[in-house]
Amino acid sequence: SQLLEDVYAYNDYSYSGRGPGCEPRSAVTPDLRKGYLISEFGGQQFPAKAFDDEPHRLAQALHHAAVLNDAIAQQGVAGALGWCMADYNTHREFGSGDRICYHGVTDLFRNPKLSAAVYASQKTPRSPSDVVFEVSSSMALGDHPGGFAGACWVFTNAESVRLYRGNDFIAEFTPDRRGRFAALPHPPIEIQDFVGSLLEKYEGLDQSTAPQVAAILNEMRRDALNLSPLSRARMLSLRLGANDLLRMYYKYIGVLGGPSSVYRFEAVWHGRTVRTVVKEPVQSVRLECVVHNPILTDGPTWDCAAVSLRAIDQNGNLLPYCGEAVQLSVEGPVKILGPAIVPLRGGMAGTYLATTGEAGRAVLHCRMEGALDVEAALTVRKRSGAENAN
């Protein structure tokens, strides 16, 4: 490649999940006096479908976070543009065999995947409504190999995250300003402790022993079959038997098929809780319908509104494995652009509503098996002749 204009733009697809997130500028551009922009990254290096399993969706989010972090940390890089905002239709030689490229941080209907929260959370909040708070894990053990829960990250611009198990406070977590994502304005927060002081409270362990046992249990949560030498040494020094350890593991971490726990995550901003996310087994399913532009103006051409559909649980959490079909119908001066029956993919779908030349009130009706029917109202205005002339 060569420098043709004032800014050297380079598509950097070098990151594969390990090592630096981007190449050194000095190894790429022939002229360090000129501006330098990473014009693309990510994309085919780590596509993720909205209906992929939890570890894969998380890995895509961390992939974007790593490249953004290292681009910010490197002096002389004007910016880095992730490829890309939304999944897109493509030709038969590309994509995932269905002529769709799943390179986006949103799906085809602009519904956000987990990786979209990486970008959204980099804005510094000015009010509680600006706080982004996305927990990567459903806390469902069955979504992971062997029933080991794996990693849990929170993508947020809050100051800290508090975790509760039932009514018990576990721990408060803050961004790691020296870790892998330290250069980001708001690094994602890894939740590493799911035991806290519960062993002191319920097992009677002293303040020296309890943290060591908790560390073993938290490591077992990620992979109980491959304990580190440090954890094995702790077991020996504490004379902790396998039966006692397993009993506490079942009680404080949980196993596949055992009693489930309710986890509450709280976003703390300016010393108070401004957002709450509750993770527990699904008890009910609700269809959510959001019209992004509920006031349309017809004339001199037609206007259009995008509609997002999501299947959510009783706590408002997305259900990424819900693939039910949603039946759509309308009343009033709008028409559906696209099919009247749309399947949820990754628990999400969408449609578009266009004006038909008339003014008035319009209603979109949505019906899905297993959930209550929902509807959304729109107002269609007619542009006046004088406005049309202008």
PLM regions: where:
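Short, well-ordered beta-strand segments
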Residues: 103, 168-172, 321-333, 339, ...
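Extracellular Ig-like/FN3 beta-sandwich strand-entry sites
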Residues: 258-262, 302-304, 358-361
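Substrate-binding/catalytic cleft of secreted carbohydrate-active enzymes
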Residues: 1-115, 122, 128-145, 176
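Catalytic cores of secreted or luminal carbohydrate-active enzymes
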Residues: 84, 89, 94-288, 317-319
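Beta-strand-rich structural segments
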Residues: 152-156, 303-320, 363-366
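Short, solvent-exposed loop/linker segments at the N-terminal edge
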Residues: 141-147, 295-305
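Low-complexity "stalk/linker" and mucin-like segments enriched in Ser/Thr/Pro/Ala/Gly
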Residues: 180-191, 331-348
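Extracellular/luminal low-complexity segments enriched in Ser/Thr/Pro
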Residues: 252-254, 350-358
